[in-house]
């Protein structure tokens, strides 16, 4: 993808992409207050983005199915609605200057196996958001995508927007990545659509990796829960496998800059563009998670397990979850796509975002986010080595028994082709 040159420094997301107001001899006219809407505004990223914009003087609407767990500021309005509800979107988008489409479903855990829900929200919801943006004459749309539109299990080292294509849709092992890739493309294809009565819809997409930061509610608590249950006593994958992460503060910065870069004041530099966004560093997941193990009072994983075993286990867990879903909830410890994410290097450059958006990520430490997290949890003492080994042995025997039963009753194939690639 090619982009328009020159850009300027960071400003607040206030330029509305409209013709500048004419000055008069009388007292100056005050600029109209910017009005933005954030879908998925009840989630961690959506709420953080909305809060930042509200502090800068922007009128903010947060739209989500669930109310945020954090307190709303006076400058923020919350609308409880679903992105699949066209009438609700049409009412909410009235007078909006910019839409940040953050809402999605199926990122991790058992959610990744809810195919119908994932499809209807990630693809169907995005189609409706684009359609209502046009009908309501919203000039700017920023879509929060994911690095998974390009990563599907094959190594990527310092990939960029031009050299790394979309991963083939039919080769994704999870529906979340597939539907996010479709929504990513739909958003970019919508760029340049004419608006009723004049004007043009300008769109761009941001592709972040996993998010961390204070009060993050998905990745850190889930891993911490597994650690406390002694489910993470092994490690897998190449010790050299690396990935990116992004602090919520940096991702919010990128969204604000992207919205600004879709205005006439910035020459529409981001129009029709995609950007990888991360902290500018690559890490090995197990090394990066070391502060979490330490702060919780548990030993780091020390048993190396073949990735093929873990991948097969994940496949069995997925099958068991689907088979038992009508009876009980049995969320998988890991899914196949998560195993690939941990075991296979996939890192991306942020040079394009730096050059075109003026993106300049601040430095953060995962250990600081861990420190805030453990302050609200009870530190558990380390167990003795003998007791730990006994627990591990019992769990291993139980797992092997369940694996044998699952393979027998579910008729699961060995997944040779997929396993050999890991």
Swiss-Prot record:
Cross-referenced InterPro entries: 3Beta_OHSteriod_DH/Estase, Lipid_A_modif_metabolic_enz, NAD(P)-bd_dom_sf
Binding site for NAD(+): 180
Record's keyword annotation contains NAD: yes
Record keywords: NAD, Oxidoreductase
UniProt EC number: 1.1.1.-
SUPFAM superfamilies attached to this UniProt entry: NAD(P)-binding Rossmann-fold domains
Pfam family, one: 3Beta_HSD
BP term (GO), one: steroid biosynthetic process
GO terms assigned for molecular function: oxidoreductase activity, acting on the CH-OH group of donors, NAD or NADP as acceptor
Catalytic site: 176
Stretches the record annotates as Disordered: 1-32
The keyword NAD belongs to this UniProt entry's keyword annotation: yes
CDD domains: 3b-HSD_like_1_SDR_e (cd09812)
Stated family: Belongs to the 3-beta-HSD family.
Name this protein carries in UniProt: Putative short-chain dehydrogenase/reductase family 42E member 2
Originating species: Homo sapiens (Human)
């Amino acid at each position: 993808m090619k982009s328009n040159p020159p850009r300027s420094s960071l400003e607040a997301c206030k330029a509305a992409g409209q013709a500048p107001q004419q000055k008069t001899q009388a007292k100056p006219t005050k600029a109209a207050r910017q009005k933005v809407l954030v879908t998925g505004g009840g989630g961690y990223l959506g709420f953080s983005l909305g809060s930042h914009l509200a502090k800068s003087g922007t009128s903010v609407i947060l739209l989500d199915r669930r109310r945020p767990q954090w307190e709303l500021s006076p400058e923020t309005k919350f609308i409880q609605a679903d992105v699949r509800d066209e009438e609700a979107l049409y009412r909410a988008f009235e007078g909006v200057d910019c839409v940040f489409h953050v809402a999605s479903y199926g990122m991790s855990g058992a959610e990744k196996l809810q195919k119908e829900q994932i499809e209807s929200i990630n693809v169907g919801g995005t189609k409706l958001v684009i359609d209502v943006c046009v009908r309501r004459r919203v000039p700017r749309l920023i879509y929060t995508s994911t690095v998974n539109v390009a990563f599907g299990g094959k190594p990527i080292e310092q990939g960029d927007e031009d050299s790394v294509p979309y991963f083939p849709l039919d080769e994704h092992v999870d529906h979340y990545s597939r539907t996010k890739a479709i929504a990513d493309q739909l958003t970019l294809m919508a760029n340049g659509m004419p608006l009723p009565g004049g004007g043009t819809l300008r769109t761009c997409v941001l592709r972040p990796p996993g998010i961390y930061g204070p009060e993050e509610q998905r990745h850190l608590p889930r891993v911490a829960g597994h650690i406390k249950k002694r489910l993470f006593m092994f490690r897998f994958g190449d010790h050299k496998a690396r990935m990116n992460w992004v602090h919520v503060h940096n991702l919010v910065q990128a969204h604000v800059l992207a919205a600004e870069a879709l205005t006439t004041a910035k020459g529409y530099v981001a129009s029709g563009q995609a950007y990888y966004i991360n902290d500018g560093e690559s890490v090995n997941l197990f090394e990066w998670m070391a502060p979490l193990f330490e702060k919780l009072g548990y030993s780091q994983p020390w048993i190396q397990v073949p990735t093929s075993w873990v991948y097969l286990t994940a496949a069995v867990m997925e099958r068991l979850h689907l088979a038992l879903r009508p009876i009980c909830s049995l969320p998988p410890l890991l899914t196949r796509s998560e195993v690939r994410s941990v075991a296979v290097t996939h890192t991306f450059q942020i040079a394009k975002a730096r050059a075109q958006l003026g993106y300049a990520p601040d430095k953060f430490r995962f250990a600081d986010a861990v420190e805030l997290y453990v302050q609200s949890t009870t530190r558990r003492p380390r167990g003795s080595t003998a007791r730990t080994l006994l627990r591990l042995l019992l769990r291993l025997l139980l797992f092997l028994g369940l694996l044998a039963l699952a393979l027998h009753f579910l008729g699961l194939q060995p997944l040779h082709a997929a396993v050999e690639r890991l």
